[in-house]
């Protein structure tokens, strides 16, 4: 068809497959009563005269020609076989096993060859059945829409097509004569509400749905292009409760469902938490959005329309509860999005939270008896709020507002509160949930769980609700849990942007304020939010996942350290041949940026003389000094003297400490001493920041990390992946490592003990 939408081919294909499974309104359910009596008169009228004719012909044949008796009997049997299969075929068409069995039994005696019955059709899946047995005329539209959507979503129908089919079917049902479905009034002298039998209504709804699907396959109507939907993640569990009393609603194409052509794009999401039974939650999930559209102020004031829809839904369910002796209620929270406006309405303790730029934003305050304004309202009506495991209204319910609960009116009312906010594009997502979630997970924890899940799965949000439900259950929730996460923007792009920029913003900016004791800042940041990782339970399939607290990531950002291109480690394989390979000569290893410690600048000011580097390594015995070269700032290379207060080495390279057991204590006494000849004094600074903040490169070759210090202790931190010149030397080094836990370096006159 000219001008058809691109999705028409997909929709037609779905309708063909759907009709193959949904072969009629009575498939898998109760048969229609009308076609039952049609095949009955056919087998009764024809077979009756046949026995008389056969007997007369047989008598005449026996008198005139006795020898032809066998031929007459054979002809009679052939006639019986020609007449008998007719009722069998009719019974098979009807699908009634009892009539088919009776016809087969009637044809079986005296006959050896009976044709096998035709194969039976596979059983059809049962159709959705309404919960209530009777409804009013005002509730027909909601019931019709719900029955259609249930049946279509069971076959994974696209949301746009499901909304269009449900709207067309509901309109056909509302325009039909519903008087045939009325329940007769009771003759008790009282005037009651006109009620409709829901089973008959359901049969009519499915019949109309089947007819519309058949017509749309042949001639698909011209429909507007489906809108872009908000990505959602939904999960609900019964948890440890005996029954599941939560219900949720997700209508991404609100305009199509109610045939609204002059409105902006609209979406509707709701969570209802029932108590005392599931009837109230089901009723609200079916009828509240229908009552919303029927309000006069809906086009220009959706927030007020939501409040009135809650009130109307509460009043009608209270009437229904009186007719059917129901004693239950439900809390509820609804979010309605129209264009760039977010409208929220709620009764009870079901909640919704907004996350903007990674921060939780409070949109509402739940209705609980411990709220001072709610307590005053209840007491003004003559009720009371008492503590009985929790604050309860009249010692019974722990919520102060709800739909239903007729026996607790007016203390527990159905008046909803509302709130509206403008969506400026910085919003991330919404989390709608019942009290089973929010009683154990606070908003900040929920944000952490979502952010961790998104970064672990590269922005895939399909299992976010499952992760939130699992976090509430693991936190101790035993109530029903329902969670809906509505993403207001593409979180995959948000995660990718954060991976590029977040670590730059959070790592080593400004001065060092943690005393330099940031040992954890040695690894690469592989995730944008490394600080808050939540472990997923095993039943969600995250068994192989590593918690980010085991990753070496920064938990306390420090000052910025700009390291040279060959940062912080002495690679002796890259030194010029004219320079000796010893600790007496070290390359410049560190350069502090703008955030350098003040003491480092003070050292540069005090240093006015450079010592020449000797080309040979002297033997040391006892305490001594040797020069080392460091570049602390931009003033150039400085020669410092490192003094050992106790003997630290003896002999030349490849020799070990003579007293290995005392190496740790000896190394702990290393200090920096800086000399200035013309002032004739020594300055002993105490460093409170690390001079190196990078891991060893782990490449083949000898490397030595710079001296490191902390506010509490001084020590040398090293990593020496020694050169593997020969297998014999490598084996010897490994033997020494296993025996003494020392790492021998062939180019240095001492060894380092592993920390």
Swiss-Prot record:
Residues 102-113 have a biased composition (Low complexity). Keywords: Cytoplasm, Hydrolase, Magnesium, Manganese, Metal-binding, Nucleus, Phosphoprotein, Protein phosphatase, Repeat. Heterotrimer. Interacts with PAX1 and ARHGEF6 (or ARHGEF7). It holds the Pfam family PP2C. The modification Phosphoserine is found at residues 535, 548. One of its GO terms (cellular component) is cytoplasm. InterPro entries: PP2C, PP2C_BS, PPM-type-like_dom_sf, PPM-type_phosphatase-like_dom. Residues 114-129 have a biased composition (Pro residues). Mn(2+) 2 binds at residues 273, 435, 479. Residues 518-527 have a biased composition (Basic and acidic residues). The keyword Manganese applies. Coiled coil: none annotated. This is Protein phosphatase 1E. Sequence repeats lie at residues 31-32, 33-34, 35-36, 37-38, 39-40, 41-42, 43-44, 45-46, 47-48, 49-50, 51-52. It comes from Homo sapiens. The keyword Repeat applies. Binds 2 magnesium or manganese ions per subunit. Its cofactor is Mg(2+); Mn(2+). It is an enzyme of class 3 (hydrolase). Protein phosphatase that inactivates multifunctional CaM kinases such as CAMK4 and CAMK2. Dephosphorylates and inactivates PAK. May play a role in the inhibition of actin fiber stress breakdown and in morphological changes driven by TNK2/CDC42. Dephosphorylates PRKAA2. GO terms for biological process: cellular response to lipopolysaccharide; cellular response to xenobiotic stimulus; negative regulation of protein kinase activity; peptidyl-threonine dephosphorylation; positive regulation of stress fiber assembly; signal transduction. Residues 21-131, 498-537 are annotated as: Disordered. Its EC number is 3.1.3.16. It is found in: Nucleus; Cytoplasm. SUPFAM superfamilies: PP2C-like. Residues 231-488 form the PPM-type phosphatase domain.
